[in-house]
């Protein structure tokens, strides 16, 4: 069976891994998944990530905990294959009053909502992380 939404699958694996107190989660790799993982690491939501293998590359994300609780309290897919969500630069959402991050796909690549606002770019809202 083919996977319809690989990004939702990635977010669900992260959510389930943290619910089960796993150290790391593995999933099939893609350029978009690696870019999302890099953004989550830069924002401090995951400890690390690595791509393993050449032909069937796997993305391994090392989860981050603080005082035995997951750092990511909420991770939610916004734009999905059946309903894409695009926002202009002045319509970009602020997640949890600025405490969370909206992952935005812009013409200059993936970036956080703050970086997109600063660069004056809008785009597709991939997910919210808080």
Curated annotation (Swiss-Prot):
SUPFAM superfamilies: Ribosomal protein S8 (SSF56047)
Signal sequence range: none
GO molecular function per UniProt: rRNA binding; structural constituent of ribosome
InterPro entries: Ribosomal_uS8 (IPR000630), Ribosomal_uS8_CS (IPR047863), Ribosomal_uS8_sf (IPR035987)
GO CC annotation: ribonucleoprotein complex; ribosome
Gene3D superfamilies the record matches: 3.30.1370.30, 3.30.1490.10
PANTHER family: 40S RIBOSOMAL PROTEIN S15A
Descriptive protein name: Small ribosomal subunit protein uS8
Annotated source species: Vibrio cholerae serotype O1 (strain ATCC 39541 / Classical Ogawa 395 / O395)
